[in-house]
């Protein structure tokens, strides 16, 4: 569950290392974002010569949460960190590589991220 002020790791090679959620998109008073949801983030930590720099405001999709996700068969998957992938204005990933596993729930709206990921759970 990601809410405003939550710090997330960045799971791609866009140049950002840590981002902070500043808005959960998808409703006027929506409080939490889960895996697959779109959020507005600001870059808090970035590497030199990356595609993004500190202070940039971008959209991102949540790919891993510590809360995890429950499946219809009763199983649940949790991760050790909260992570997001940064998106451009066309809702396509800024980076060309994805680090770490992602869940099958991303297949519905983010097939590009699933195809770049090294492991899909």
Swiss-Prot record:
- Sorted alphabetically, which SMART domains does this protein's record hold? Ribosomal_L14
Q: Which InterPro entries does the UniProt entry name for this protein?
A: Ribosomal_uL14, Ribosomal_uL14_bac-type, Ribosomal_uL14_CS, Ribosomal_uL14_sf
**NCBIfam families from the UniProt entry:** rplN_bact (TIGR01067)
Q: Which Gene3D superfamilies match?
A: Ribosomal protein L14 (2.40.150.20)
Which terms in the GO cellular component ontology are assigned?
cytosolic large ribosomal subunit
Q: Please give the subunit comment from the record.
A: Part of the 50S ribosomal subunit. Forms a cluster with proteins L3 and L19. In the 70S ribosome, L14 and L19 interact and together make contacts with the 16S rRNA in bridges B5 and B8.
Q: Which UniProt keywords apply?
A: Ribonucleoprotein, Ribosomal protein, RNA-binding, rRNA-binding
Cited function: Binds to 23S rRNA. Forms part of two intersubunit bridges in the 70S ribosome.
Would you identify the family this protein belongs to, as annotated? Answer: Belongs to the universal ribosomal protein uL14 family.
Supply the PANTHER family for this chain.
50S/60S RIBOSOMAL PROTEIN L14/L23, LARGE RIBOSOMAL SUBUNIT PROTEIN UL14M
Source domain of life is Bacteria
Q: Which Pfam families does the annotation name? A: Ribosomal_L14 (PF00238)
Q: Name one GO molecular function term.
A: large ribosomal subunit rRNA binding
Question: What is the originating organism of this protein?
Answer: Pseudoalteromonas atlantica (strain T6c / ATCC BAA-1087)
Q: Is this entry keyworded Phosphoprotein?
A: no
- Designated name of the protein: Large ribosomal subunit protein uL14
**GO BP terms:** translation
Residues annotated as coiled-coil are none
């Amino acid at each position: 569950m990601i809410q405003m002020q939550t710090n997330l790791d960045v799971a791609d090679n866009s140049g950002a290392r840590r981002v902070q959620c500043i808005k959960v998109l998808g409703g006027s008073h929506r409080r939490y974002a889960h895996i697959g949801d779109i959020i507005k983030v600001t870059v808090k930590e970035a590497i030199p010569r990356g595609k993004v720099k500190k202070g940039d405001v971008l959209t991102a999709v949540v790919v891993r949460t510590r809360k995890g996700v429950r499946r219809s068969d009763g199983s649940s998957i949790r991760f050790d960190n909260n992570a997001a992938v940064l998106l451009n204005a066309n809702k396509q990933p800024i980076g060309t590589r994805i680090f770490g596993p992602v869940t099958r729930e991303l297949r519905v709206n983010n097939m590009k991220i699933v195809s770049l990921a090294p492991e899909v759970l």
